[in-house]
Curated annotation (Swiss-Prot):
Signal peptide: none annotated. It comes from Yersinia pseudotuberculosis serotype O:1b (strain IP 31758). This is Ribosomal RNA small subunit methyltransferase A. Specifically dimethylates two adjacent adenosines (A1518 and A1519) in the loop of a conserved hairpin near the 3'-end of 16S rRNA in the 30S particle. May play a critical role in biogenesis of 30S subunits. Keywords: Cytoplasm, Methyltransferase, RNA-binding, rRNA processing, S-adenosyl-L-methionine, Transferase. The keyword Cell membrane does not apply. Its EC number is 2.1.1.182. One of its GO terms (cellular component) is cytosol. Belongs to the class I-like SAM-binding methyltransferase superfamily. rRNA adenine N(6)-methyltransferase family. RsmA subfamily. It is an enzyme of class 2 (transferase).
Length: 272
C-alpha cells in the first residue's frame, strides 16, 4: 500500500501534506484549543478533517482555509461538516485575517496542522494580524517550536524567536511523534499555543525597524553585534544602550532588541 495515500487522498509533497491520524493526539489538541460555540474559529489546512470534525462537533459554525482544491471539495460535500463550514479555497499566506475578524465581529481563534514547508513564513504573516487574533494553536516541527520558545544564549534562539515573543506569549503544549501521521514525516512534531499580548511588554514604535535589526543580526549570527550591526550603531552607542558590543545576536534579549529598534527609530525621525 502506498503510504502517501490516506482515506483515498494522495498526500501532495508540494503542499507538505502529512495527515494526523492518532486519536489521542487529536483529542489532546482539541482539548487544548477548547472551542466554545459562538467563537470565531478558523482552521488553516484542515486536510481530511482530523481536527475539523471534533472541533466542528463543538461549534455551530467555523471557517477553514484549504489550498488543495480536492480537499476543499471533500469538505464541501462532507455530510457532517458541509453545513457548518465556510470554506476558503486559497493560500493562507494571502488571507486578510483582519477582514475575517471584522466579518465575525470578534477576534479569531486560529489553529491548524501547518504544512512544515510554509510554517515560518505563515507565522510571520499571522503576526501582522495579531490585533485581530485572540489565540493560535499550531502543529509544527518540534525544531520550530523549540525556536519559538527559546531564550537568549541558545542555538535555537533566532529572529523567529524574537518576533514571535515580541507579538505573543508562546506556550509549548504537546510533543507528537512521526507515527501520529500518514505519511509519517521524518521529524518530530509539537503543538504550540501563541497568545497575542493584550499589552505589549516591550512596545516598539516601528516594527519594521525591529524586523530589520533582527534580520541583519541573525543573518550574521556568528559575528559580534559591533560588526553585524556596525552600520547602524557605533560601539559607544551600543554601550549606552546597555549592550556589550562583543556579544553575538543570540546573546541579546527580546527587550534589548526592542530598545535598539526604538533608539534607531528616534534617530531616523526628523526633529521638529
Amino acid at each position: 500500500m502506498n503510504n502517501r495515500v490516506h482515506q483515498g487522498h494522495f498526500a501532495r509533497k508540494r503542499f507538505g501534506q502529512n495527515f494526523l491520524n492518532d486519536q489521542f493526539v487529536i483529542d489532546s489538541i482539541v482539548s487544548a484549543i477548547h472551542p466554545v460555540p459562538g467563537e470565531a474559529v478558523v482552521e488553516i489546512g484542515p486536510g481530511l478533517g482530523a481536527l475539523t470534525e471534533p472541533v466542528a462537533a463543538r461549534m455551530d459554525h467555523m471557517t477553514v482555509i484549504e489550498l488543495d482544491r480536492d480537499l476543499a471539495a471533500r469538505l464541501a460535500s462532507h455530510p457532517q461538516l458541509k453545513d457548518k463550514l465556510t470554506i476558503h479555497q486559497q493560500d493562507a499566506m494571502k488571507v486578510n485575517f483582519s477582514e475575517l475578524s471584522e466579518q465575525a465581529g470578534q477576534p479569531l481563534r486560529v489553529f491548524g496542522n501547518l504544512p512544515y514547508n510554509i510554517s515560518t513564513p505563515l507565522m510571520f504573516h499571522l503576526f501582522s494580524y495579531t490585533d485581530a487574533i485572540r489565540d493560535m494553536h499550531f502543529m509544527l516541527q518540534k525544531e520550530v517550536v523549540n525556536r519559538l520558545v527559546a531564550g537568549p544564549n541558545s542555538k535555537a534562539y533566532g529572529r523567529l524567536t524574537v518576533m514571535a515573543q515580541y507579538y505573543c506569549n508562546v506556550i509549548p503544549v504537546l510533543e507528537v511523534p512521526p507515527t501520529a501521521f500518514t505519511p509519517a514525516p521524518k521529524v518530530d512534531s509539537a503543538v504550540v499555543r501563541l497568545i497575542p499580548h493584550v499589552q505589549m511588554p516591550h512596545p516598539v514604535g516601528d516594527v519594521r525597524m525591529l524586523s530589520r535589526i533582527t534580520t541583519q543580526a541573525f543573518n550574521q549570527r556568528r559575528k559580534t553585534v559591533r560588526n553585524s550591526l556596525g552600520d547602524l550603531f557605533t560601539s559607544e552607542q551600543l554601550i549606552e544602550l546597555g549592550i556589550d558590543p562583543i556579544l553575538r545576536a543570540e546573546n541579546i534579549s527580546v527587550a534589548q532588541y526592542c530598545k535598539l529598534a526604538n533608539w534607531l527609530s528616534a534617530q531616523s525621525t526628523p526633529q521638529k
